[in-house]
Regions:
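Short, intrinsically disordered, low-complexity terminal segments
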Residues: 6-8, 24, 30
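Ser/Thr/Pro/Gly-rich low-complexity, intrinsically disordered segments
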Residues: 6-7, 15-18
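Residue-identity detector for glycine
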Residues: 12-13, 21-24
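Short, positively charged and aromatic/hydrophobic N-terminal segments
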Residues: 22, 37-38
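Aromatic (phenylalanine/tyrosine) cluster motif
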Residues: 30-32, 38
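Intrinsically disordered, low-complexity activation-like regions
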Residues: 43-105, 110-121, 126-227
Length: 227
């Protein structure tokens, strides 16, 4: 659920369809149409300039290939440009961003996505998930997600998919169903199935110092057990 392998299709250019990696799982979890409406940010801007810089970096300056593959250079770029910002966001210092939908989305991206780049393969990469989840739930409750583009909404809902709660996974399925992208919904269903079976993501166990059950150990040997 964190960073799947490189998509052959995206490595050669943009794509509007899901491709399968060597594990048999989608190499890039989300499908984004080539239309700028799905890749570019909204014409409106976040009121806070720093929040807007996050939106611009993620949706205008970065690509799906960078979003969903392990890329040391991309991780380093985020660390250099936004590392201090991530530390501040983790302390809850950017409540002022929540005055508009894009500002709220920027805070979610910093906590839910940048954390996975900057703190990759460490427990800290998941430490901000509860805060990200609450921000997503609040965004939905206020109806502010409805004013975002499809790709923006997909990232707004990612904390639901990252959750190890069966209840929250149900909400993830509802939101990705409403979003109307069958490929994205399929990926959400794959996440939900793992949580329904294990109550957690087994591929996180080693990073978080959790012991595998015998069933989890067997599962981790199968294709598609990790995201």
């Amino acid at each position: 659920c964190d960073r799947p392998p490189t998509s052959p299709a995206l490595a050669g250019g943009s794509t509007n369809s899901l491709t399968l990696g060597t594990t048999g799982l989608p190499a890039v979890p989300f499908s984004f149409a080539e239309s700028p409406r799905y890749i570019r940010s909204m014409t409106s801007h976040a009121q806070d300039a720093t929040a807007q810089s996050v939106i611009q970096f993620w949706f205008d300056e970065s690509s799906p290939k960078q979003w969903f593959t392990k890329d040391a250079a991309f991780d380093a770029a985020i660390q250099t440009r936004f590392g201090k910002l991530l530390d501040q966001a983790a302390l809850g210092e950017f409540w002022g961003w929540r005055s508009d939908a894009l500002g709220r989305l920027a805070e979610i991206i910093v906590l839910d996505q940048f954390s996975r780049n900057v703190w990759r393969d460490t427990p800290k990469s998941f430490a901000q998930d509860p805060m990200s989840l609450v921000l997503t739930q609040e965004l939905i409750a206020l109806g502010l997600d409805q004013g975002l583009t499809e790709s923006q909404r997909a990232f707004a809902y990612m904390p639901l998919m990252h959750s190890e709660s069966r209840v929250v996974q149900g909400e993830s399925l509802r939101q990705f169903t409403a979003l109307g992208n069958s490929n994205n919904l399929d990926f959400a269903k794959r996440h939900e199935a793992i949580i329904a079976r294990f109550g957690r993501y087994p591929h996180r166990n080693a990073i978080l110092g959790r012991d595998n059950t015998a069933e989890e150990s067997a599962f981790l040997q199968t294709p598609g057990s990790s995201f």
